[in-house]
């Protein structure tokens, strides 16, 4: 069977940037585990705040965490109470000074993570898997997507044998490196077990900036 490479990992360094921006030698393993702990903690604390991407940058004894969210008001809280509480907890977790940046996602229907999360939550509320996928596809296309593909796999409708069923609209050129494709997978906990949700969204082409060579050529 043909396997698909991760669309984001394939484009890192070409049109996508890293989610963790730091360099370390001896401390690499410690920093990596710390990053995983930060991401896990933030996703648990802000499970209902539509947080998509968590970017982490490091300086000496300082950690900058950028949260991309569709609900910045929920993350900040009244008078900044929620974000202050989150910062204090992250300071305690890491033992370092943590600075939090909040970046609003203007079009959540073009964010694969949020679209997948929406489908998964609908499946948990017993919405038909075909309907959940088709509604998500319609919203994404209306929001300006050039193409979208979704897939739900597992014991669909409680069937004894697990299977995968997907829908797509428009084009999703997975092999084109300049294609801005957002990808995410989520899980839905249903009474029949877990269902996997995958979403690919093609948002148009991005031409990487030309690198200047010597002589100005």
Swiss-Prot record:
Q: Entry's CDD domains?
A: KH-II_30S_S3
Q: Which UniProt keywords apply?
A: Ribonucleoprotein, Ribosomal protein, RNA-binding, rRNA-binding
Signal peptide as annotated in the record:
none
Q: What terms describe the molecular function in GO for this protein? A: mRNA binding; rRNA binding; structural constituent of ribosome
UniProt record, GO biological process: translation
One Gene Ontology cellular component: cytosolic small ribosomal subunit
Q: Name one Pfam family in it.
A: KH_2
Q: Which Gene3D superfamilies match?
A: 3.30.300.20, Ribosomal protein S3, C-terminal domain (3.30.1140.32)
Query: What range(s) does the KH type-2 domain occupy?
Result: 38-106
The organism's place on the tree of life at top rank = Bacteria
Q: Which family does it belong to?
A: Belongs to the universal ribosomal protein uS3 family.
Q: Which PANTHER family match?
A: 30S/40S RIBOSOMAL PROTEIN S3 (PTHR11760), SMALL RIBOSOMAL SUBUNIT PROTEIN US3C (PTHR11760:SF19)
Q: How the protein assembles, per its UniProt entry?
A: Part of the 30S ribosomal subunit. Forms a tight complex with proteins S10 and S14.
Describe the function of this protein.
Binds the lower part of the 30S subunit head. Binds mRNA in the 70S ribosome, positioning it for translation.
In Swiss-Prot or TrEMBL terms, this protein is called Small ribosomal subunit protein uS3
The organism named in the record is Streptococcus pneumoniae serotype 4 (strain ATCC BAA-334 / TIGR4)
Q: Which gene encodes it?
A: rpsC
